[in-house]
């Protein structure tokens, strides 16, 4: 039994242009999904065939075309190329337009997106990036009260700042974490927690979920009230060869964490990724042509305590994936709830 099970789709902004990406969000609702999230990259991980439409513009377009989907970023970095006060204003506006449907997923950032837009000096170490993230979240929440805010932090400041159009209760903030330090912060301070699949189950069962629980307990919060989201990388197709080949576009995901966080040029990123063999690329994915096998490979994430499954399909024919998902996988997954 999985309490609060939700199924969503990752709209791959690195793979599809603005119009196709909007239609993908609309199709997600038509296929019965509960949420759709989008990445927020200034540059894609691929130079050839890559895309990078603006997440906030996409969210408003999808919001106008849908009625019930939860919409959000997975994830945005509100700390370098953005001023967090402006991010707070943008999401407050969307929260007024689409009440109860908008969330802000945030992370510590990647050089690929920030250096191209003018960041000077050495790319900061994790300690500074994490400190910036915590400070930006605090500032945004202060602004979502609707009060005048004089904020003087180490990295950001406001003077008599007010956001005049704010939904009641502000905007839910989901914290993305790849390790226990940020996961504890998510448990302490996030309405939601975000992680990604394919890294070995011990990471989730021994590190991430226990850290979220620890953070929640220290803040006297109920762990069950935190939406535990995981992006599940799945290449499902009734044709096994297609299921394997579809992963190739997303070879950059199989680069090391250091490469992904430090390479600042899509051309360099693409060259490094394309040097990887398809077998290594596919290791990060659930690759299957059998629905029962696919669900059996997804179920450990539910057993680990994650309740909000957002599926990232790598193929270019996203309608085919959604059709197959609605027919073969969604009923089996919802039967677990």
Curated annotation (Swiss-Prot):
Name recorded for this polypeptide: F420-dependent glucose-6-phosphate dehydrogenase
Residue numbers binding coenzyme F420-(gamma-Glu)n: 40, 77, 108-109, 113, 178-179, 181-182
GO molecular function: coenzyme F420 binding; glucose-6-phosphate dehydrogenase (coenzyme F420) activity; oxidoreductase activity, acting on paired donors, with incorporation or reduction of molecular oxygen
SUPFAM superfamilies: Bacterial luciferase-like
Keywords: Carbohydrate metabolism, Oxidoreductase
HAMAP family to which the protein is assigned, alphabetical: F420_G6P_DH
Residues that, per the record, bind substrate: 196, 199, 260, 284
Gene: fgd
Active-site residues annotated for this sequence: 41, 110
Keyword Oxidoreductase applies: yes
Purpose of the protein: Catalyzes the coenzyme F420-dependent oxidation of glucose 6-phosphate (G6P) to 6-phosphogluconolactone.
Species for this entry: Rhodococcus hoagii (strain 103S) (Rhodococcus equi)
Gene3D superfamilies to which the protein is assigned, alphabetical: Luciferase-like domain
């Amino acid at each position: 039994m999985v309490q609060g099970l939700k199924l969503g789709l990752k709209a791959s902004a690195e793979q599809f242009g603005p119009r196709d990406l909007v239609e993908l969000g609309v199709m997600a609702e038509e296929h019965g999904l509960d949420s759709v999230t989008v990445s927020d990259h200034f540059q894609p991980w691929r130079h050839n065939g890559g895309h990078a439409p603006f997440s906030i513009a996409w969210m408003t377009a999808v919001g106008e075309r849908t009625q019930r989907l939860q919409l959000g970023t997975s994830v945005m970095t509100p700390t370098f190329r953005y001023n967090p006060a402006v991010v707070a204003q943008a999401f407050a506006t969307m929260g007024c337009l689409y009440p109860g449907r908008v969330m802000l997923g945030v992370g510590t950032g990647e050089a690929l997106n920030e250096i191209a837009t003018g960041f000077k000096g050495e790319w900061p170490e994790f300690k500074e990036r994490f400190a910036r993230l915590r400070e930006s979240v605090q500032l945004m929440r202060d602004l979502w009260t609707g009060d005048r805010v004089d904020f003087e932090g180490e990295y950001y400041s406001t003077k008599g700042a007010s956001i005049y159009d704010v939904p009641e209760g502000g905007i839910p903030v989901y914290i993305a974490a790849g390790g226990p330090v940020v996961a504890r912060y998510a448990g302490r301070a996030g309405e939601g927690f975000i992680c990604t699949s394919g890294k070995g189950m011990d990471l989730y069962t021994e590190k991430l979920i226990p850290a979220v629980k620890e953070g929640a307990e220290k803040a006297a919060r109920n762990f069950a009230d935190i939406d535990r989201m995981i992006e599940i990388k799945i290449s499902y197709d009734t044709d096994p060869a297609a299921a394997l080949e579809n992963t190739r576009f997303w070879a950059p995901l199989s680069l090391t964490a250091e490469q992904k966080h430090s390479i600042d040029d899509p051309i360099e990123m693409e060259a490094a990724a394309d040097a990887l063999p398809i077998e290594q690329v596919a290791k990060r994915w659930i690759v299957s042509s059998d629905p029962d096998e696919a669900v059996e490979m997804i179920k450990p994430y539910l057993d680990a305590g994650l309740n909000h499954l957002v599926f990232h399909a790598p193929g270019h024919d996203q309608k085919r994936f959604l059709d197959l998902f609605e027919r073969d996988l969604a009923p089996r997954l919802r039967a677990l709830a």
